[in-house]
């Protein structure tokens, strides 16, 4: 991960922290006040989706990143192995905590449904679509942890 990609990783972390905080607050209270907390989930969706996008972009070249724009599915497909396989497996494991039947087929179906969540939800009043906030949160959590580990490894190498 070069210096520019490390900066993108830092940006991804910032968007993740805001999105995760809002998600965790809203999920806790949405059953008691759905109208108020539904609208507070919108920034969580946008921030989590954007953090995933930026995280994926830390692992691919700039040309592919520009080509894929905000499409999470295309971005993930550009991430090389073994990172892509590790990410997919980790998200599946995390999602199984909510849905024991969640598998690789489910992963790709959910990713397809949420692939443009950033674009779909940043202007919700124009074209908000269905998004699975739990999937976005779990995926963002997994990828952010990989970005953090990669950054630490890079910093260790640079210190030598």
What does each of the following model-derived ranges do?
Residues 1-44, 59-63:
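Charged alpha-helical initiation segments
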Residues 1-13, 17, 64-160:
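Long, charged low-complexity segments
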Residues 46-57:
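Conserved beta-strand->loop/alpha-helix structural units within folded catalytic cores of enzymes
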Residues 24, 28, 52, 144-151:
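Structural signal for well-ordered, non-membrane alpha-helices
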């Amino acid at each position: 991960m070069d210096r520019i990609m490390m900066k993108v990783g830092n940006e991804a972390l910032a968007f993740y922290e805001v999105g995760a905080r809002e998600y965790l607050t809203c999920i806790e209270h949405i059953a008691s006040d759905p109208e108020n907390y539904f609208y507070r989930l919108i920034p969580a969706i946008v921030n989590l989706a954007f953090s995933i996008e930026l995280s994926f972009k830390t692992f691919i070249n700039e040309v592919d990143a520009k080509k894929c724009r905000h499409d999470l599915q295309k971005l993930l497909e550009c991430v090389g192995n073994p990172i892509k396989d590790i990410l997919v497996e980790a998200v599946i494991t995390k999602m199984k905590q909510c849905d024991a039947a969640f598998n690789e087929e489910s992963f790709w179906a959910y990713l397809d449904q949420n692939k443009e969540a950033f674009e779909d939800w940043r202007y919700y009043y124009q074209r908000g679509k269905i998004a699975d906030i739990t999937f976005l949160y779990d995926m963002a959590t997994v990828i952010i942890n990989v970005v953090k580990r990669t950054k630490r490894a890079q910093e260790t190498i640079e210190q030598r």
